[in-house]
């Protein structure tokens, strides 16, 4: 487990991505980092991820005034900004396992005190070959957050309060 940091950061050509729709922009940027995936796969995965589930508003810039915009990050399926990563990651995991000919079950462990749990459960629910267990502190989430996690449907999910 842990976090991975690249040895160097690729330079993103801002002019090349200006004007792209969010799924295209996401695929272009992610492709700079995840070079083991084909650009075609990333484009398809981003389109599938940020399309209908985000109501056509992934990366929506809401005008505040003539020159000020607000980036709205709550248009995902759980209304949490974490949907942006946790809806794409399962597709990346399944593709990586396929490319590496890995067939064993994968267990995702998540610890949360709030929105991450629901976003992770929603993203990974019913993904073949993947189990997810979400741990949360008893009394450490809001009642709404607890209910969001507890009512998530899926055959491969475990929710554990500690």
Regions found by a protein language model. Give the residues of each.
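A structural signal for isolated positions on well-ordered beta-strands in alpha/beta enzyme cores
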Residues: 107, 131-133
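N-terminal entrance/gating region of PLP-dependent enzymes' catalytic architecture
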Residues: 4-79
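Hydrophobic, small-residue-rich alpha-helical packing segments that form membrane-like cores
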Residues: 133-144, 154
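Conserved small/polar residues in nucleotide/adenosyl-binding loops
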Residues: 160-162
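A structural-propensity feature for long, helix-poor, extended segments
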Residues: 148-158
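Conserved beta-strand segments of alpha/beta enzyme cores
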Residues: 69, 131, 156-158
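Well-ordered mid-protein domain cores that form the structural environment of catalytic cofactors
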Residues: 69-126
